[in-house]
């Protein structure tokens, strides 16, 4: 692997300044004004990048979970409807992209499936982010590699063999691996340090 990876205008690697990414994820609850306020607050706090999540819910939610009834901030609804409500579309991301551009701030989304990757690529992202839950989706990883962008991949819940397979699928040249834990609080036996 190289000594550093170029992520947009920033180099990431040993001896480089820390790149601070504010994780917005889906904490906006599908509310664009709330998301835009989070972007502003992240900028004010010194973040370099804001990160969202993008998924095609019909592809990412197992069929047996889609009809489960959940209690949500908007009342009772199926899990599929709840996840749909959290997703932003093109007009929303246009607003996010515009605000980030005006603030001189990069933005990115974790992509959970190939249609979401293709959607993200229309915005010319500085890199592609793979969430821990998708590290074993070799088809998605290979599509990310073909996109020709640097990739940042999280490794929570993954075994060493799964991580090695992901590195092969993504290619090591422009890859940043994030050591992640997916249990909070994490017991020391699961830290893998």
Annotate the PLM regions.
Residues 1-193:
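Catalytic cores and adjacent flexible loops of soluble metabolic enzymes
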